[in-house]
Amino acid sequence: MRTFSRLFLIFILFSAVPVANAAAKPGGRLIVIRVANFGWNLVANLKIDGQTVANIVQGRRYDHRIPAGRHVLTVSVVPNNQSSQPTSITVNVRPGGTYIFTAQWDSDQVYLRPTTLSPAEMAKLGL
C-alpha cells in the first residue's frame, strides 16, 4: 500500500508541472479606459477574439493580462439604440508589453483609440 501511495504522489507531482508551466506563459497587459463623456447610461462592451470579456461602465476600466500573440479587440455600445456597428482593432501582444486603448465616440460610432501615456500620466491613473 505504501508503494502505491508513493507512486501516486510522484504521478501527481509530475502531472502538476505542465499545468504550472502553462499558467506561467508570458503575456501582456491590456487596459481599456472608458472616456468620461461616453454617456452615463451606456456601456462599452469589449470582446477579445469574439468573446465578451467586459462591459465597461462609467468610471471603470478593463485591466487584465492576456496571452501573447495577435488578438482582435472589438467594442460596441450597450444598449445600442442607434444601431451602430461594432468596430475592431488588431493588437499584437508581446510578452511584458502594456497596451492601452480608450473607448470613445466618433459621430454615431464607438471605437478603440490606441493611447500613448507618459510615465507621469500612467502613475496618475494608477497604471
Regions found by a protein language model. Name each.
Residues A20-L127:
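Short loop/turn and low-complexity linker motifs enriched in small/turn-promoting residues
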Residues M1-R6:
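Positively charged n-region of N-terminal signal peptides that target proteins for export
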Residues L7-A16:
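Bacterial N-terminal signal peptides
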